[in-house]
């Protein structure tokens, strides 16, 4: 990670860390790096989620883009994967999404996509960072006809919805689907998509007001949708995050079906159809041990990466794999889109239900999970957790006690000032005890003093 760019673009508290001034400079520097070889007036798409700070940052970013001669097409509120798809579909030179995904409303972020719809490489981000840190801005400052322009392309939402419908062979007639849009970017997309697929719909978290994104709803709060599914007697529930690149499912009896299980279900189905490239799925080190045991029983190969959907996508492209993702709900179907896509993943999952005639609880039960606990600890300097001798000592002690029947993962978050402690063990009691033992040391050594 660089000075400005984390694992998912530039993020920070809006108007104090991620300021309009920084957004303007990101527009100038990022726009220049991504379009300098394109020719006169390259086209860049700009979109945002529903945060109150979105319009402020959008205005500043667009000003920066226009100042280096870029033609901006403004998409309005749309999901991150919608932007990625439309970048290629519209032949744009690049695109920018303004969102902090699942983070609280005070945060916001800016992430770029290249003309191929993929997130930027480390080299591209490093070049933008070098320009940001240059004492004097010497980039072109055209005038008159050399300036860029701004136009709206709000109909891009419908084009994206129509594309998603083409990725499956079934409609959803006869299914009652509960949707939780996290008061975010899928609020204006999900109900239209599933209505077009002839499903019966109940929705929550679909009334954004600028302040309620991810607030007790969405993929980071699946318990809200679980209660909603039971109340509405739905066949399945889908909870998206603020920018729509994640999904967590709920089965008909209110159980959470996380990204691991969704990937497992879809991998099994794709393999049966002869559609799983190289008989391999890509996941991160956060996936449950039960996920890997289940894949082994199915004789499906797996490739593990560091945490972050960008690393999953990199491995998928390198190995020509078409399915990968994260336990958190970032799932990439590379045959259909270039990034995690909650809506796409949701319809692929329900398509498997329709094709097999099985309930989601039946499909999910085919993968057994190890008890797992995750603690997020706010710290003063997340990057030194692996260097702390007391933290290393307690991890070693726990791993020795596990004797191979479990695992520990302690790592810095790529997007927030947190250390994440994840433990899996044979029983829930052991998992809780080991996780608390390690977390206590991390808190003692590194936690912020409130």
Swiss-Prot record:
HAMAP family: GlmM_B. Mg(2+) binds at residues 101, 241, 243, 245. Binds 1 Mg(2+) ion per subunit. This is Phosphoglucosamine mutase. It catalyses: alpha-D-glucosamine 1-phosphate = D-glucosamine 6-phosphate. Pfam families: PGM_PMM_I, PGM_PMM_II, PGM_PMM_III, PGM_PMM_IV. The keyword DNA-binding does not apply. Keywords: Isomerase, Magnesium, Metal-binding, Phosphoprotein. Its EC number is 5.4.2.10. InterPro entries: A-D-PHexomutase_a/b/a-I (IPR005844), A-D-PHexomutase_a/b/a-I/II/III (IPR016055), A-D-PHexomutase_a/b/a-II (IPR005845), A-D-PHexomutase_a/b/a-III (IPR005846), A-D-PHexomutase_C (IPR005843), A-D-PHexomutase_C_sf (IPR036900), A-D-PHexomutase_CS (IPR016066), Alpha-D-phosphohexomutase_SF (IPR005841). Belongs to the phosphohexose mutase family. Catalyzes the conversion of glucosamine-6-phosphate to glucosamine-1-phosphate. Activated by phosphorylation. Its cofactor is Mg(2+). It comes from the Bacteria. The active site is at residue 101. The keyword Zinc does not apply.
